[in-house]
């Protein structure tokens, strides 16, 4: 079974980790230009928000440029169907990987799933 781009990375590798309110699209573009990590993650995006009325605002967090590749979209939700839809959206948008946030220590996020 192929592990995709992960198999091709030299080790150790440098990753721009997903950080809420930090790794938005403009920040990632600056980092791609001056730091060029081996892997870039989006900040986490609420799958609930994407499909329950906040699509236009949240999809902006999923914009990326070719310079950011490989790029991984990170989502969170407690609803498996919404996670599936978010993953399908990430595939449509051309992401190289999908990450499910299952352990955010932020209390306000914990309550949301």
Explain the meaning of each model-derived region.
Residues 44-51, 102-113:
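Glycine-rich, proline-tolerant flexible connector loops at the mouths of alpha/beta enzymes
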Residues 2-3, 8-14:
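Extreme N-terminal starter segment of soluble prokaryotic enzymes
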Residues 6-8, 63-68, 107-110:
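A short alpha-helix capping/helix-coil boundary motif
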Residues 2-3, 19-92, 96:
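Glycine-rich, positively charged N-terminal anion/phosphate-binding segment
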């Amino acid at each position: 079974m192929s592990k995709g781009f992960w198999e091709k990375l030299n080790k150790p590798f440098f990753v721009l980790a997903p950080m809420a309110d930090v790794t938005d699209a403009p920040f990632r573009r600056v980092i791609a230009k001056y730091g060029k990590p081996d892997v870039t993650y989006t900040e986490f995006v609420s799958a609930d928000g994407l499909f329950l009325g906040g699509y236009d605002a949240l999809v902006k967090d999923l914009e990326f440029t070719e310079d950011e590749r490989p790029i991984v979209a990170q989502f969170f939700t407690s609803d498996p169907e919404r996670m599936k839809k978010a993953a399908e959206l990430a595939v449509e948008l051309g992401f190289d990987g999908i990450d499910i946030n299952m352990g955010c220590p932020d209390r306000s996020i914990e309550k949301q799933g």
